[in-house]
Amino acid sequence: MDEKLFTKELDQWIEQLNECKQLSESQVKSLCEKAKEILTKESNVQEVRCPVTVCGDVHGQFHDLMELFRIGGKSPDTNYLFMGDYVDRGYYSVETVTLLVALKVRYRERITILRGNHESRQITQVYGFYDECLRKYGNANVWKYFTDLFDYLPLTALVDGQIFCLHGGLSPSIDTLDHIRALDRLQEVPHEGPMCDLLWSDPDDRGGWGISPRGAGYTFGQDISETFNHANGLTLVSRAHQLVMEGYNWCHDRNVVTIFSAPNYCYRCGNQAAIMELDDTLKYSFLQFDPAPRRGEPHVTRRTPDYFL
């Protein structure tokens, strides 16, 4: 299709998605094909320039994503970096992930979308995205288009050479960013190994490496964060993956920050959400927000299993 025509169609899709109306199956298919072409050119450590606004988990809470854009500025007026977990748990995974992918295809230089541990075939079959696709489309094709696309998402991003962003955390198999650049990311998230760790690990109060209670990834202490940041010339590791009640949380003597962008997570946790604005000098400020007002929540019968780690 002619590029100008496609852009026009894309703008119509974005307009529709902004009203929380899903695209057709064939539209999702062509959107995902276009997104693959763009993402395949991105690095495992995708370089991002400031100013940029960094966001954590969204988890299908579409109306709260709209609130995030209201607080942080619309795309493409504001540059965004999302650190994964677009789907599962919330009621609107389909609309949420479709909108973010559409914005990526439309404004590729202005938005970066990383892979979270929920951008996986296995996890989405348990925590809601698969069932939601079946409910909204009557078959699993849309789930397949998206989960195939997830394999192409970059694993990490580097803002101005100094702030390292990723979904989960560090890995005992990775000392340098070059180690990450050398990984083959075009695959389902493995059960173990460096790629798994980047999407599953958590910072911990105890030093060194520890066994993760999640059953994947590791816990890592302040000594590990400091060593990693120093070795790679970094000032900060920015990550998501954990519910924090204020929406953001410093740890490891400000070597690591956790950002969580799904307010009142699972519609019941009572937490605030936050995003981190980095200005052109890399000064950061946090914007906190509460859930968007909702009219008439859909009633979902099947309760998905809980894990709040």
Curated annotation (Swiss-Prot):
Top enzyme category: hydrolase
Pfam family for this entry, one: Metallophos
Residue numbers annotated as active site: 118
Swiss-Prot/TrEMBL GO biological process terms: cardiac ventricle development; cellular response to calcium ion; cellular response to cytokine stimulus; cellular response to ethanol; cellular response to follicle-stimulating hormone stimulus; cellular response to glucose stimulus; cellular response to insulin stimulus; cellular response to steroid hormone stimulus
Enzyme Commission number(s) from the entry: 3.1.3.16
Regulation acting on activity, per entry: Inhibited by the interaction between PPP2R2A and ARPP19; this inhibition is enhanced when ARPP19 is phosphorylated. Inhibited by the interaction between PPP2R2A and PABIR1/FAM122A.
List of residues binding Mn(2+) 1: 57, 59, 85
Chief location category: cytoplasm
PTM sites of type Leucine methyl ester: 309
Modification after translation (UniProt): Reversibly methyl esterified on Leu-309 by leucine carboxyl methyltransferase 1 (Lcmt1) and protein phosphatase methylesterase 1 (Ppme1). Carboxyl methylation influences the affinity of the catalytic subunit for the different regulatory subunits, thereby modulating the PP2A holoenzyme's substrate specificity, enzyme activity and cellular localization. Phosphorylation of either threonine (by autophosphorylation-activated protein kinase) or tyrosine results in inactivation of the phosphatase. Auto-dephosphorylation has been suggested as a mechanism for reactivation.
Compartmental location: Cytoplasm; Nucleus; Chromosome; Chromosome, Centromere
Keyword match Kinase: no
MF annotations from Gene Ontology: beta-2 adrenergic receptor binding; enzyme binding; GABA receptor binding; identical protein binding; metal ion binding; phosphoprotein phosphatase activity; protein antigen binding; protein domain specific binding
Database matches in InterPro entries: Calcineurin-like_PHP_ApaH (IPR004843), Metallo-depent_PP-like (IPR029052), PPA2-like (IPR047129), Ser/Thr-sp_prot-phosphatase (IPR006186)
Cofactor info, note text: Binds 2 metal ions per subunit. Can be two manganese ions, or one iron ion and one zinc ion.
Record: residues binding Zn(2+): 57, 59, 85
This protein's UniProt keywords: Centromere, Chromosome, Cytoplasm, Cytoskeleton, Hydrolase, Iron, Manganese, Meiosis, Metal-binding, Methylation, Nucleus, Phosphoprotein, Protein phosphatase, Ubl conjugation, Zinc
Binding site for Fe(3+): 85, 117, 167, 241
Binding site for Mn(2+) 2: 85, 117, 167, 241
Family statement drawn from the similarity comment of this UniProt entry: Belongs to the PPP phosphatase family. PP-1 subfamily.
Quaternary organization: PP2A consists of a common heterodimeric core enzyme composed of PPP2CA, a 36 kDa catalytic subunit (subunit C), and PPP2R1A, a 65 kDa constant regulatory subunit (PR65 or subunit A), that associates with a variety of regulatory subunits. Proteins that associate with the core dimer include three families of regulatory subunits B (the R2/B/PR55/B55, R3/B''/PR72/PR130/PR59 and R5/B'/B56 families), the 48 kDa variable regulatory subunit, viral proteins, and cell signaling molecules. Interacts with the PP2A A subunit PPP2R1A. Interacts with the regulatory subunit PPP2R2A.
Known function: Catalytic subunit of protein phosphatase 2A (PP2A), a serine/threonine phosphatase involved in the regulation of a wide variety of enzymes, signal transduction pathways, and cellular events. PP2A is the major phosphatase for microtubule-associated proteins (MAPs). PP2A can modulate the activity of phosphorylase B kinase casein kinase 2, mitogen-stimulated S6 kinase, and MAP-2 kinase. Cooperates with SGO2 to protect centromeric cohesin from separase-mediated cleavage in oocytes specifically during meiosis I. Can dephosphorylate various proteins, such as AXIN1, p53/TP53, PIM3, WEE1.
Protein name: Serine/threonine-protein phosphatase 2A catalytic subunit alpha isoform
Organism for this UniProt entry: Rattus norvegicus (Rat)
Lineage: Eukaryota, Metazoa, Chordata, Craniata, Vertebrata
Record gene name: Ppp2ca
